[in-house]
C-alpha cells in the first residue's frame, strides 16, 4: 500500500515551518541535507512503514520562509526544539542526513535526556581531523549534487535526465541559505565536539565508503565523542546514501531504532 504523506505547516518561535508527515508508530524526525530534499524518496517511505515520520523543511531552504534572525545552525536547532515541544514529540528519535546531521547533533546537545535515539548519516558539523568538507562555493550546485553520488547513474535516477528550472532554483536558494548559516567556519562548529559527550542516548553514525563531500574522519570523530555510539560504513555509496541505497539505509536505521 502506498505511503500517504500529508503536507502542512506549524508555527514555532513565531516562524512558519513546513512539514511532511506520514506513518504510525514511534516518532522519527528526519532532517534533510543542505541541498534540500525531494518530496518523494523510497527511503522516507520505508521508514514511514514502521514509524511516525516528520520531515521539516529547513527555514530558508528552497521556498520555505526565511526568518531574518536565523543566522546559524544552532538557531535552526533551537527552532526545531521548539517545534517538537509544540507538536508533543518529546522523546522522538532524530535522523540527520549530512547537514541535517549537524542540526540533529546540535539538538541532541541541547536536551540530551529528551531524545530516544540519534542517527547521523555522513554528518557535517565537526571539523574533519583529516581532509576537508567539500566547499560548494568552488563548484556549481549541479556539480556539488553530482559529487554526492558514487554511482553517476544515481543522479539521473533521482533527478531525471533533464533538470527543471524549479529544481535549479531550489538548489540555488539552498546554497544561499547554507552560506548564511554555515559559512565561517565552513560547515562545522568549533564547539560541537566538546558538547557531544553530554549526549547519552544510543547513537548510530553511518558513513558512505565513497563519500566525496564529508571525509570519513568527521564521522569517526562524531562516533568517538558520542559516549554511546557505534560507527558503520556502507559499501558502494557516496554521500547521498538515502538516494543510492534507500532501502538498505532504511533497514539499518529501522533495526537500530528497534534494538534494545
Segments predicted by a language model, with ranges:
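Catalytic active-site module of serine/aspartate enzymes centered on a nucleophile-bearing elbow/loop
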Residues: 229-260
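Conserved alpha/beta-hydrolase "nucleophile elbow" surrounding the catalytic nucleophile
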Residues: 92, 96-101, 208
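Short beta-strand/loop motif that positions the catalytic acidic residue
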Residues: 199, 205-207, 211
Amino acid at each position: 500500500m502506498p505511503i500517504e504523506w500529508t503536507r502542512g505547516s506549524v508555527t514555532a518561535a513565531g516562524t512558519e515551518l513546513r512539514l511532511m508527515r506520514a506513518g504510525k508508530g514511534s516518532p522519527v524526525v528526519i532532517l534533510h541535507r543542505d541541498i534540500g530534499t525531494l518530496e518523494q524518496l523510497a527511503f522516507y517511505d520505508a521508514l514511514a512503514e514502521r514509524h511516525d515520520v516528520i520531515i521539516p523543511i529547513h527555514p530558508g531552504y528552497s521556498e520555505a520562509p526565511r526568518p531574518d534572525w536565523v543566522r546559524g545552525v544552532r538557531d535552526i536547532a533551537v527552532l526545531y526544539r521548539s517545534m517538537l515541544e509544540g507538536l508533543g514529540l518529546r522523546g522522538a528519535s532524530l535522523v540527520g542526513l549530512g547537514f541535517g546531521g549537524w542540526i540533529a547533533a546540535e539538538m541532541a546537545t541541547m536536551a540530551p535526556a529528551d531524545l530516544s535515539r540519534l542517527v547521523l548519516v555522513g554528518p557535517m558539523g565537526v571539523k574533519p581531523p583529516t581532509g576537508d568538507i567539500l566547499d560548494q562555493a568552488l563548484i556549481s550546485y549541479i556539480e556539488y549534487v553530482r559529487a554526492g553520488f558514487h554511482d553517476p547513474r544515481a543522479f539521473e535516477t533521482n533527478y531525471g535526465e533533464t533538470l527543471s528550472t524549479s529544481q535549479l532554483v531550489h538548489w540555488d536558494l539552498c546554497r544561499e541559505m547554507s552560506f548564511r548559516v554555515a559559512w565561517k567556519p565552513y560547515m562545522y562548529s568549533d564547539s560541537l565536539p566538546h558538547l557531544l559527550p553530554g549526549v547519552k542516548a544510543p547513537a548510530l553514525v553511518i558513513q558512505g565508503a565513497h563519500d566525496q563531500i564529508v571525509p570519513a574522519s568527521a564521522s569517526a570523530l562524531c562516533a568517538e565523542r558520542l559516549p554511546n555510539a557505534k560507527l558503520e560504513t556502507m559499501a558502494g555509496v557516496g554521500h547521498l546514501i538515502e538516494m543510492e541505497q534507500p532501502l538498505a539505509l532504511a533497514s539499518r536505521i529501522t533495526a537500530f531504532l528497534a534494538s534494545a
